[in-house]
Amino acid sequence: MGEESQAAGLPSSPPPHPLSADSSLSPADGKGTPDPSRGITRRLTFPLLSVTLLVSFGSSMLYGYNLAVVNSPAVHIKDFYNATWSQRYGHGLAPGPLTLLYSLTVSTFALGGLGGSLLVGLLVARYGRRGTLSRSSLLVLLAGGFMGFSRELGSPEMVIIGRSITGLHAGICLSVVPLYLGEIAPKNLRGFLGLMPSIFICLGVFSAQVLGLPELLGKERYWPLFLAVVVVPASLQLLLLHCFPESPRYLLIEKNDVCGATEALRRFLGMPDVQDAVQEMKEEQRSLSSVETTSVGQLLRDRAVRWQTLSVAVVNAGMQLSGIDAIWFYTNTIFENAGIPRSQIPYTTVGTGAIEVVAGLIGCFTIEKLGRRPLIITGFCAMGVCSAGITLCLLLQTALPWMRYVAVACVVGIIAGFCMGPAGVPFLMTAELFTQSHRPAAYVLGGSLNWLCNFTIGFIFPFLQMSAGAFCYLVFCGVCLLVALYVHLVVPETKNKTFVEISRTFAARRAVLPACRGATLKLRGYGALEGSLEGSGSGSGLGSGLGLGSGSELGSGLGSGSGLGLESGLGSGLGSRSGFA
């Protein structure tokens, strides 16, 4: 009755939700409107921090490690391929086929990732979020065995197969980790915890650069072990992840396990009384019973969310077409072309890796203050300018030897710009731009584009570099600047905004209907799916506002039945699926 009285404009003071950053209502205004000054900021509990660090270390970090692990031992891997080919067929490989085989080794990681991203929906529905992450660790153990014993068995195919399996694992985890963290994170910590995996991606790259030093695993005899080190974080996650609860939303809404969800909430929040959160998820469960999950095909055909869909496609494709993977895969080659002595290159790359981690930390600790748009726009602009700078440096380094050091600075700028924003914000934006019914399809679409572009860049960059020379980086410059311009013109800021407000912004751009002027009622939502409804009584048409029915979180009722149904954007139909997850 508390929510209904608020919708009717009556004063009420419901108990604050334990997870909402702004769930308290001001009793003094007499209208039940949110008062941000009286908002409740949820503290970061030890279980929340621990599980975030564990899945970031055991899953996200492996993605960064596998991106950079083929960089240092590239010469040794090519020598192994050449020697094996000579033993089998009596002659070595020509430079062209050898480059093709090595490019396949690099890019098959992305092909596996593409396959993994397509399996995410099926896996999380069957095994849950935590269960999917635990089972995916077994893939890493299998891949480590293939790559670790490849030289002993004289099989280059085992290296390629192992790389594809690690890609399969990465494709699964890049979507499941933010999904899991988003469902267990309080609203005021969603951005902070959501960018934590991107820090570990940078840390994975840094770890590969350090272990690839000649004093450690960079020697010729150690490269199979260097590739197989991934089994260590995966084993740790496999052993410890079962100590933490499954996602409460998954347990209650999808498995109808009220007791399990209650216990999980108590563990994550560190408080005994979680009945408000449980009741709220029950209301969401009842509302979702009438909502059908959208497929990728339906998502692409739905004109009501075409700008959201295009935005997710642009930022995910731009994330890879920016050339960051070319920088990570071929850092040694870039530095060698820039004139850095070969003996100094491994130490130079380690320095860039340390800067990556620092840049990731800056983005993680500033996203809740600066917002999503400034981080991603600044990051892409920095990457574009530095890509053009690399071209300029490579062209002038013969006449101006000091330009080689500017080229190194440009590489550092590209990596730092990427880690500050574009590395993690696209995954966060996918959750925030879509409602519950559209979100799984959006993750499949964004993840597929991400990995497809990853494969394309990893495969064609060596040939692009051979044909275009220094000018190949101008392609990446153009992509980065275009993505930054698109985000500036189209994508709204989503920090501290409800899904109604975000979708209303997109609806105004589509000019489907005028912006609604109803009072906003912020419900005390949980995790990444907190929503709100526009409360105005019983709407009777497009111009009269939105009718609030039973007061459930997703707005399963529409007043007298003549209000406007909402899902993932205004103007998607009258009396259709309603509310925001």
Task: Annotate each PLM feature.
Residues 267-277:
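Short intracellular "coupling" helices and adjacent cytoplasmic loop segments at the cytosolic face
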Residues 277-288:
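TPR/TPR-like alpha-solenoid helical repeat scaffolds
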Residues 1-269, 286-545, 549, 569, ...:
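Alpha-helical transmembrane bundle of multi-pass membrane proteins
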Residues 542, 546-548, 553-560, 564-566:
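Low-complexity tandem-repeat tracts in intrinsically disordered regions
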